[in-house]
């Protein structure tokens, strides 16, 4: 994993990746049921980034339907999973759920990348949960950032995040020549359109690298390394 300028940044809707994980953990533990309502809320939270659905799922994490207590469960899950730069301080959009209005929810590109890698490998919560989360991300409707420059021959499973001065995206990209994970966060930007342009350009360059790289050379390097470690 390559990480550049690793630090906590405003998560915007990337925090929903961790809410999704916390909900799936509670389902795995038998404390929540994967019923039609839960499925609908998860779908709304991930595929169209609905804030009300997110707040409701956080409430579901507490037996009394208390959002603040549910949020503590999200943060306990985040800590237990080892995501160093991620924390949910406030609910989304609804100001009555802002408990620390001067502090923004945070994550990092590396934390998001590690989460997506574990989903990709089938190791996040469980293999079944990983596949369910991957399917939600593959059905993403907000695709104007990383996916926008990816040809139709490849698939993208992504989750975006945006505020008045943030443009974030975290994605698994599946290509004919190898899959990769790309997470880009740009916050405190003066021009959102320029930030999106830069994000799209980076996505295009990285995709081109993966499609045009000398895979035979990579294979030879892997084989040589394997022999050295025998």
Regions found by a protein language model. Give the residues of each.
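Short, well-structured active-site flanking segments
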Residues: 25-43, 126-130
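Sec-exported extracytoplasmic/periplasmic mature domains
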Residues: 20-29, 46-51, 58-63, 75, ...
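Active-site-proximal beta-strand/loop segments in catalytic clefts of secreted hydrolases
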Residues: 46-49, 57-61, 83, 89-93, ...
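Extracellular/periplasmic catalytic domains that process cell-envelope and extracellular macromolecules
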Residues: 34, 106, 150, 163-165, ...
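Mid-domain, small-residue-enriched loop/turn segments at the edges of structured enzyme/sensor domains
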Residues: 54-121
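Acidic helix-start/capping segments at beta-turn-to-alpha-helix junctions
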Residues: 35-54, 59-63, 93-96, 220-225
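Structured C-terminal helix/loop/strand segments within mature extracytoplasmic catalytic/sensor domains
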Residues: 114-144, 155, 165-230
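Active-site SXXK
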Residues: 8-32, 45, 182
């Amino acid at each position: 994993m390559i990480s550049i300028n690793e630090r906590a940044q405003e998560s915007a809707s990337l925090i929903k990746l961790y809410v999704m994980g916390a909900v799936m953990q509670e389902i795995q533990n038998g404390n929540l049921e994967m019923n039609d309502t839960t499925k609908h809320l998860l779908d709304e939270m991930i595929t169209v980034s609905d804030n009300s659905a997110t707040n409701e799922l956080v409430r579901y994490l507490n037996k009394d339907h208390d959002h603040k207590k549910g949020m503590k469960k999200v943060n306990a899950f985040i800590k237990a999973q080892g995501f160093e730069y991620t924390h949910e301080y406030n609910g989304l959009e609804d100001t009555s759920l802002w408990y620390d209005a001067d502090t923004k929810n945070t994550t990092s590109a590396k934390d998001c990348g590690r989460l997506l890698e574990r989903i990709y490998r089938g190791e996040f919560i469980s293999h079944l949960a990983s596949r369910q989360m991957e399917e939600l991300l593959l059905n993403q409707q907000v695709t104007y950032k990383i996916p926008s420059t990816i040809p139709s021959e490849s698939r993208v499973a992504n989750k975006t995040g945006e505020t008045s001065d943030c443009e974030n995206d975290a994605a698994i990209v599946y290509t004919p020549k190898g899959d990769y994970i790309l997470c880009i966060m740009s916050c405190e930007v003066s021009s959102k359109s320029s930030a999106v342009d830069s994000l799209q350009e980076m996505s295009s360059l990285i995709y081109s690298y993966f499609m045009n790289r000398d895979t035979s050379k990579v294979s030879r390097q892997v084989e040589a390394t394997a022999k050295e470690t025998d």
